[in-house]
Amino acid sequence: MRIGGLDVGEKTIGVALSDELGLTAQALEVIRRRSLEQDLARLDEIARHYGVVRWVVGMPRNMNGTYGPRAELTRAFMERLAGHSGLPVEAWDERLSTMAAERVLLEADVSRARRRKVIDKMAAAVILQGYLDARAARPPESFV
């Protein structure tokens, strides 16, 4: 059982996966967005190949906790993903996820060109790891 994490942007979707135990998140790939149908088809392929049972999608929020226009687009994407895949889809606060991913890549001395290629999947891993950590800290019945 794996959980998939997504960082949904206008041009790309960063994808991360949990390990089988649902303890750690690893960056998987960056999907270059072409059309909603192609995006959903690729996510279906990933779900089938890796045994994804749930998607966690980063929900953009302002620093004051409010939702902006990007959040509405993300909600619409989540609804389409849930309807298309038949899997549960949860929103998770993505505030500062890209900044955290950037910091990790800078500390690892990754070049600017390489950072640009991997930042979205790293942000997805940060989002998913936050979800997994919160899940581990709560009683199992709260995640039914």
Curated annotation (Swiss-Prot):
Pfam families: RuvX (PF03652). It is found in: Cytoplasm. Keywords: Cytoplasm, Hydrolase, Nuclease, Ribosome biogenesis. It comes from the Bacteria. The keyword Heme does not apply. Transmembrane segments: none annotated. Its EC number is 3.1.-.-. GO terms for biological process: rRNA 5'-end processing. Could be a nuclease involved in processing of the 5'-end of pre-16S rRNA. NCBIfam families: RNAse_H_YqgF (TIGR00250). Belongs to the YqgF nuclease family. This is Putative pre-16S rRNA nuclease.
